[in-house]
Amino acid sequence: MFFPLNYIKLSPHRNCLEKYLKKELPKLEGSILDIGSGGRRYDYLLKIKPEAIDTKPNEAKGIKFGDANDLQCKESSFDNILCIEVLEYVKTPQKAISEIFRVLRPAGTLILSVPLMYKTHEDFLRFTADYLKELFSGFSSLEIKPIGNFYTIILDILRGKIAKLKFKPVKYIFYLPYLFLVLFIPLSRLSKDTAYISGYLITAKK
């Protein structure tokens, strides 16, 4: 269901991404490794609690230290791997994808997302569809799904500017027209133009 207020809590890009993840993640069967888990934000969509790793471990949440370029896992040890909005922070993505391929079981599923036209956030890289096809060429099947469109990119920029306003009453005043524009997001999805997108969701099979 479409809730405009969600677009204040999360960016339009994140909302579009989570719309897809809510469809895909509940389908996963078997063991799961969540790379760059952060706060285990997607556990609620999964049937099985994943093994979570991050460069910033969290003992309270059961998140161990892990590096995407050097996964301390045996070969073919997971049925599924999640890597959501992580690869842009990795300096050598080819090495990370090789490691993911190594620890994924035959016929296992990788679900990965990356931003494209999105604000800078201490990331190293951005990925086009053509580069992603080359990067995942070793997988037996690959689906690259665009996230967002021109309209959601503009809303992302507006939301970012409003969030930086320090005087709260003014901030709330600006959020009103922003939320009005958010109401047109479902209509914007009718556009088939993929020249301007905020990112990609990749589903790959080993």
Predicted features along the sequence, with ranges:
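Short, cationic motifs built from Arg/Lys/His that form the positively charged side of catalytic pockets
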Residues: 102-105
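S-adenosyl-L-methionine-dependent methyltransferase catalytic module, highlighting the catalytic core
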Residues: 91-95, 99, 109-205
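Conserved N-terminal segment of class I S-adenosyl-L-methionine
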Residues: 1-73, 80, 194-200
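A short beta-strand submotif of the Rossmann-like class I SAM-dependent methyltransferase core
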Residues: 83-86
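Glycine-/small-residue-rich active-site loops that bind phosphorylated ligands and cofactors
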Residues: 70, 88, 120
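A short, aliphatic-rich alpha-helical micro-motif
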Residues: 25-26, 75, 97, 136
